[in-house]
């Protein structure tokens, strides 16, 4: 089970093998300016639901609670996310480094976890119509899958995240990661 958790957290947010796949959101379709994540800076209470066995038909989820801290870097042109979450049987730490590319007007989201100690390849995309959508390709359980990661701000104090895998190049999707963040207000 520990090996499964290490392997799963290593790929859960798009951290496995990138296969030169271009994001579905092109630079022409989305004109980001490098401040799309400004709404997220600060500390958040996080609840995560993670599908235990993606792409198997399983409906068994693991639930985690934790804290996310989002730090501004380079005046907002980058940011660092520190997620620390646990449940009764597992403790997971993830870090995400998000970089804005001014030439393409897209963001690259790199993720690492404390179990593997490695930085994965990026999910690439941007924000349009009030939500961020990011894509990559990676290998999961020996199969090449398309990964979609969606960030939806619901208010100034609430954000919803979803990750889904597609084993058929985006025809169908299975959501395998759901996170809801609530801002921790200064006292």
Residue spans of the language-model regions?
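Bacterial N-terminal signal peptides that target proteins for export
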Residues: 1-12
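Hydrophobic small-molecule pocket/channel-lining residues, especially in calycin-type beta-barrels
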Residues: 24-187
């Amino acid at each position: 089970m520990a090996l499964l958790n290490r392997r799963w957290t290593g790929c859960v947010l798009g951290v496995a093998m990138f296969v030169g796949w271009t994001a579905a959101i092109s630079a022409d379709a989305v004109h980001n300016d490098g401040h799309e994540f400004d709404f997220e800076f600060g500390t958040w209470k996080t609840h995560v639901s993670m599908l235990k066995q993606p792409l198997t038909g399983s409906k068994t989820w693991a639930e985690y609670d934790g804290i996310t801290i989002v730090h501004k870097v380079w005046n907002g042109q980058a940011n660092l996310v520190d997620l620390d979450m646990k449940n009764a049987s597992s403790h997971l730490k993830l870090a995400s480094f998000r970089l804005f590319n001014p030439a393409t007007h897209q963001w690259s989201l790199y993720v690492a976890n404390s179990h593997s100690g490695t930085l994965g390849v990026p999910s690439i995309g941007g924000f349009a119509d009030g939500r961020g959508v990011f894509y990559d390709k990676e290998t999961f359980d020996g199969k090449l899958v398309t990964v979609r990661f969606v960030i939806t701000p619901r208010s100034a104090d609430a954000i919803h995240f979803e990750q889904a895998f597609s084993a058929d190049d985006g025809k169908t999707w299975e959501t395998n990661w759901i996170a809801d963040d609530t801002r921790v207000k200064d006292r």
